[in-house]
Amino acid sequence: LNTMTIAPSSPSTAALKRELKAAEARKRTMALLLVAPLAIFLLLIFVVPIGTLLTRAVQNPEIATALPNTVAALSGWDRKTPPADAAYVALAADMTKVADSEAMGALARRLNTEIPGYRSLVAKTARAMPLKGDNDAALTPAQTRAKFIDVDARWGDVAYWQAIAKNGSQVSPFYLLAALDHKQDGFGHIVQADPDQSIYLAIFGRTFVIGVAVTLFALLLGYPLAYWISTLSERRANLVMILVLIPFWTSVLVRVAAWIVLLQSEGLINTALIGSGLISHPLTLLFNRVGVYISMTHILLPFMILPLYSVMKSIPPTYQRAAVSLGSHPFAAFWRVYVPQTYPGVGAGALLVFILAIGYYITPALLGGPNDQMVSYYVAYFTNVTINWGMACALGGLLLAATLVLYAVYGRFTRTNVSLG
């Protein structure tokens, strides 16, 4: 059929258009079906966990769930003077209802994070429920207040009621503020946390210092090695690259254990240094920052070498030779002609190593000391030891946010298209 002889309005033209549209629809459907497994995998393994993490960082259901009537009674309270008798009546009703349930334990744990000792107050009060007068007579609101204060005088302290009032919502910035060494005072204003609780900004600072140091060490070692590999013949380059990739085939625990053997006081490194006469006493290389730097640099070095090598391999060697033939010094030609062309590899490698470094847990935990633990250690601590998912998610979410901000700033100022994939 010669389509050039078909009129635009003929039935054959309309049928041809329908067939073309159907073919395009089939192609789009096939493309979506091919991409669907990867999209579902990313959704379930990446998007949903991160979304859950960010959600748990601001969830605050314990008080609103266990004490709904009390929260409602305190909604109009000025938080300066003791609450009205109606608040005591509401608290008595709520605590009687949840006295023997799991909600009471969650309530006690949550309030104890606000005021140390609140857990014992909640437990003591729960044992006294329900409140009754003489001969099991019903109590008036004023008598209910008096009963609470008889159970424990702390119920007359405004601070304990403020802790309930400011956490009446299902969503709260409590954990995020705590991770930034801040808190809400009794009136809901954001203030600096107490000195004995202001530790997390220092931990974040330590994490980024270690990440930057490991990135610089990996760059200093990886750049010349990647350059040397790029100048080798293909056969020799493949052989050296196999040696570079060996750490990928070895468990992290095995590599860390090997460094423990090497760095200990009677290890190979100290033995060799003492035998050569360079030192007279063993160096302290374990359970401090030195051991962390050495092991993390070794483990992350391939992540720096691979992006650098891929970029260097694509740079024609004729550029440097041309610069030298025009009178440039060989080092000047290398520095001014060759190095700028490797910036994409430097950026990709540095970003990859840094992001991996700030999330490391097992290496600092085994080779570092108490002052060398990073944010990941405290995420694991709150997850596995104290079972404080809110704090763990807040620390993890802030670390993720800081990483994304640094990535965006890097891309903005360098104007390079560095991909994390």
PLM segments and residue spans:
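Membrane-interfacial helix termini and adjacent extracytoplasmic/periplasmic loops
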Residues: 20-21, 185, 255-297, 367-371
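Membrane-topology segments of multi-pass transport proteins
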Residues: 1-33, 52, 56-201
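Interhelical loop and adjacent transmembrane-helix boundary motif
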Residues: 27, 66-69, 365, 370-411
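Transmembrane-helix boundary motif in ABC transporter permease subunits
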Residues: 17-19, 23, 52, 214-245, ...
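Amphipathic cytosolic juxtamembrane alpha-helices at the membrane-cytosol interface
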Residues: 24, 28, 237-238, 289-291, ...
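C-terminal transmembrane helix and the adjacent membrane-cytosol boundary/short C-terminal tail
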Residues: 11, 309-320, 324, 393-421
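Transmembrane alpha-helices
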Residues: 40, 244, 298, 304-309, ...
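Transmembrane alpha-helix signature in integral membrane proteins
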Residues: 197-228, 339
